[in-house]
Amino acid sequence: MPFALHGIPVSRGVAIGRAHLLAPAALDVSHYLVDEDQLDAEVERLRAARAAVRAELAALKRDLPRDAPEELGAFLDVHAMILDDEALAREPEALIRGRRYNAEWALTTRLEELMRQFDEIEDEYLRERKTDIRQVVERILKALAGAPVLVPAPVPALAADGEAATGVIVVAHDIAPADMLQFRHTVFHGFVTDMGGRTSHTAIVARSLDIPAAVGVQSASELIRQDDWIIIDGDAGLVIVDPTAIILEEYRHRQSERALEKKRLQRLRHTPAVTLDGLEIDLLANIEMAEDAGAALAAGAVGVGLFRSEFLFMNRRDELPGEDEQFQAYRGAVDAMHGLPVTIRTIDIGADKPLDARGDEFETALNPALGLRAIRWSLSEPGMFLTQLRALLRASAFGPVRLLVPMLAHASEIDQTLALIAKAKRQLDERGEAYDPGMKVGAMIEIPAAVLLLPLFLRKMDFLSIGTNDLIQYTLAIDRADNAVAHLFDPLHPAVLQLVARTIREANRAGVPVAVCGEMAGDPSMTRLLLGMGLREFSMHPAQLLRVKQEILHAHCERLEPLVDQVLQAFDPEEQAAALRQLARP
């Protein structure tokens, strides 16, 4: 009997095959006290398990093909960094020696503490990083149990007609990027998970490998049985179990069309993004580490529109990264882009994204999303902020760098930020350090107050970048982490569209460059809408770039503008839907 499950679409395409169920690592471990004379041996047992995981991750990275997206190796590096972090190394050992916990108990105790910290994070992307920590802990637990650190690869099942299947669909409560990479040479054609969101590393790897996927499919691993025949509709986040012959035929046809589309898209990699009426559009990439620059270039990005610097600051127990460490990371991205511009956002962290090294400063925040975060926190820590500013300025000596400041809302915040940048320049002058004295400084527009103060921002800042994810959240008063109201998170809400359009149009009139760097920029269904508002600079995940470029190549901006005006004037849902249909490409 066919039935359908609904989840979150994270990677487009259609996958057809038999279900291969992955059992999660057991986190319900035994708890017992270790004898005093066995404490050293228990610590060594934990260290040996971590060493086994480290060796497996290194082997996976070593075996990556030369043409693999660079971000895949970067994700393995992230797991290796988490593995060696004191939170999973020294602190569990302290629990073994101090409380006589067995290794599994010590490890899961620390995991529970970390999970509570990450649950307080408002930002969806950073909140999803707790999944990476859990996945690393699961690997260590497997090693402690003597099980293989990497899950066994699936084997081909039989199709309905008895012939060998074209692939299998991995179904799991969750699946780590490293496991996905292990499957790359097998018949693994897609995956379905109970957990996850659009910004999880698993979802990002799926997009990088162009593997159809649906995540957040509640109870999928319980409702789907081993060897069930299933279809993933990655565009809709739909999973069809035991489909009829008619449904199978329909989706096989979609697969064929998708294969042709992929070939056409690849031919666009080196095609300039120019509209039918001759307007050049800049397509840039969002990255989180220097290693991601390769994927940006491979997709045809003309620069980095958002380098999230906060990842240098995460998972540190005792101290924040120093100036030289930050400089090397920023310069790495600049060098990797070979003269193309790199926009680096200053640390966007705080009460809703607590750092391990400063976590106690934020424990009393009653509403962390509205608390001491982003530029508010940077200005409250001028010593830390000056260190980052000096590192950013030094990197600007090696290529075009733009500095982007998050969550600005007050004139005083702008003035304080610019004053500290000037102070950082004076400090570098005193040291004889090189930097670009004309480095551009821009503002994130992600709070409604910033839109209402646009004349001030346009007078004092060199460029603007609209962070649509936070702008939607703050405009609609929606907590994206709360499933009870998540359905109200609507990028097409008339109020949101009014704010985005106003920002773009006023910036254009003032001659100030403006970009969109949130999820709206990478959604091809939004491309024509944003073009009609006047947007000429998009920044997105590299995997989204070619589909957005395809929309741009078929767009005529002058003709889109009156259609977009109709969308902006439609406040009734039915009227808006009709206006959007008029806007859609025929």
Swiss-Prot record:
UniProt-listed Enzyme Commission number(s): 2.7.3.9
PROSITE patterns per record: PEP_ENZYMES_2, PEP_ENZYMES_PHOS_SITE
This protein's record includes keyword Cytoplasm: yes
Binding site residues for Mg(2+): E446, D470
Residues at which phosphoenolpyruvate binds: R308, R345, N469, D470, R480
Transmembrane annotation, as ranges: none
Molecular function GO terms recorded: kinase activity; metal ion binding; phosphoenolpyruvate-protein phosphotransferase activity
Active-site residues, Swiss-Prot/TrEMBL: H201 (tele-phosphohistidine intermediate), C517 (proton donor)
Cofactor(s) of this protein: Mg(2+)
Keyword annotations of the record: Cytoplasm, Kinase, Magnesium, Metal-binding, Phosphotransferase system, Sugar transport, Transferase, Transport
PANTHER family assigned to the protein according to its UniProt record, in alphabetical order: PHOSPHOENOLPYRUVATE-PROTEIN PHOSPHOTRANSFERASE
Complex and partners: Homodimer.
Entry's family note: Belongs to the PEP-utilizing enzyme family.
Further information: The reaction takes place in three steps, mediated by a phosphocarrier histidine residue located on the surface of the central domain. The two first partial reactions are catalyzed at an active site located on the N-terminal domain, and the third partial reaction is catalyzed at an active site located on the C-terminal domain. For catalytic turnover, the central domain swivels from the concave surface of the N-terminal domain to that of the C-terminal domain.
Function comment: General (non sugar-specific) component of the phosphoenolpyruvate-dependent sugar phosphotransferase system (sugar PTS). This major carbohydrate active-transport system catalyzes the phosphorylation of incoming sugar substrates concomitantly with their translocation across the cell membrane. Enzyme I transfers the phosphoryl group from phosphoenolpyruvate (PEP) to the phosphoryl carrier protein (HPr).
Name of the protein in question: Phosphoenolpyruvate-protein phosphotransferase
Organism, as annotated: Cupriavidus necator (strain ATCC 17699 / DSM 428 / KCTC 22496 / NCIMB 10442 / H16 / Stanier 337)
Gene assigned in the entry: phbI
